[in-house]
Amino acid sequence: MPYAIDLFCGAGGMSEGITQAGFHILFSSDINADVEKTYVNRHEQLGLIQNVNTYFHRGDIREIDGKFILEKIKNLKMFISGERKVPDDIDAIFGGPPCQGFSRAGKRDPNDPRNLLFKEYLRVINQIRPKYVIMENVEGFNDTKFYGYIGVTGKEYDDESLAPVILRNEFSLIGYNTLEPKVLLASDYGVPQNRKRAIFIAYREGEKVPRYPEPMFNEDNKITVLEAIGDLIKDENIRNKVNPQLTQYQKDSINGRTPTINGGVVRNDNQLLQNIETSNHLPIIKERFSLYRDGEDSAALRKRIEKEGIDISLKPHLIKECCEKLNMEKDEVLNILKNGNINKEIIDVLLTKKNIRTRLSKDKCSLTVVTLPDDYISPFEDRTFSVREMARLQSFDDNFVFLGKRTTGGPRRKLEVPQYSQVGNAVPPLLARAVAKEIYLVIEETE
C-alpha cells in the first residue's frame, strides 16, 4: 500500500479520496482545531489511530519542516514495533493551500498572506522529496498573478507572474517535472455538483509519468440533486412520491465508499444518521422560499415578478409584511402583485434587498456547494439544506460525521470552522479519488 501525506487537509475531503484510491495516510496537517476534531474522529473510524499508524499535526505549515514530518512518521508505533518497515520514500504528497486569496469572487489582494502558503507547501515538498505531488485549488488559481515573489531557491520573479508559471519553474528548479495544470469538473467523476477545481501534478525526475483522470460521466448520466439527496427529504409524503426507492448513489452514500485500514466497512452501531438538523425557519421565511421555482435564483425571480406578477393570496405572513411596510390594504397589495409591472420598492419589501438565493434544480447537478447554509433552497421543501445534504452533494459517505458547531456568524467566522464550512471548503471525495487513483496506478506499475 503506497504511503501519502495530506497537508492543508481540512475536514478530510481529499483524505477520503486518497484512502478510497488505496493510499495509507501517514501524516496530515491543518491549522484549525474544529477540523482537527472531525478529521481525527474520521480516521479513528477507519482504523487510522494517532501515533500508531498515522499522525495528525495541528499547526501552521510555516512552523514545521520536512524533518519534523519524517520524524513523526518514523516514530509511529507500527514502525517502531517492526510491524512495518519505515519507507525509504514517501509516495505522494497531496495538498490544497487555502484558496481564499485566489478566489475570483471579490477583490484580490496581492499581499494576502494566504497567497504565499503554496510557497510553504513547495518548501516542505523539497525537504521530503516525495515521488509525486498533487496540489488542488480553486479555478481562479490558474490566472492569479504574484508581485515580488521570491521562490524557495531564492529566484526572484517579475511582477504579475502567473501562479502556474511560477509553480512549474519552481518544481523544475528542485528536480520535478510537471503536467500542464488542468481544471477538472467534479460532476465528470460522479459528484452531483458542478464544482471546478484546478489540479496540478508534479513527479520527481526518474519517476513514471502520471496522467489526469478521464471523465467517467457525461451529460446524460451525471448524478442529479434528486438522485443524490431525494431520500433525505423530511416530509414523508413528498419523499415517497419523488424518491420511491433508493438510487445507487444513495445506497453508496449509506453503505460507505471509504474502506477501513483493513479493507472493511465503517460500522455504524447506533444506525442514526448524523448532521441532519435543519434550520427552524420563521413562517414568513418559508413563504418567501416558496416563491422560487425549481432552479430559479433571486435575479430571475425578481424579473419574473416584475414582468408577470405573482399571486401571494395564500401567504398571510408576506401579505401582512407588505401591507405594513407599504402602508396599503390587503386587496391593494394582492392586485398590484398579481398584475405585473411592479416597481422596485414593492419587490424589495416582498423579497428583501439582501435576498440572494437559488432554489437548486432537482433534475440537474448542484451548483458549487458553499460554506454558508443560506444560499440554497431545497428543490423539494421550503427550507435550506442540512449539513448532511450538503455533504451528500459533495460525495461524503453518510458515516462521515462532522463535529463542532453547526454554523457560526460575525467575527467568530474568522476563527471558527463550523460544520457547513467544513463541508463547503472540502475537496469532493470522489473527485479526489479519481485524481489519486491515477497516481496510485503509476506507483503500482513501477513496483
Task: List each model region and its residues.
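S-adenosyl-L-methionine
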Residues: T38-S81
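A short, Lys/Arg-enriched amphipathic alpha-helix followed by its capping loop at the start of a domain
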Residues: G17-F23, R42
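Glycine-rich SAM-binding Motif I of class I
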Residues: G12, E16
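Class I SAM-dependent methyltransferase "Motif I" SAM/SAH-binding loop
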Residues: F8-C9
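Class I S-adenosyl-L-methionine
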Residues: K72-N75, F79-D89, P97-N341
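Extreme N-terminal starter segment of soluble prokaryotic enzymes
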Residues: M1-I5
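Short beta->alpha hinge that forms the Motif I/post-I loop of the SAM-binding pocket
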Residues: D30-D34
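C-terminal target-recognition/interaction regions appended to catalytic cores
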Residues: R257-E447
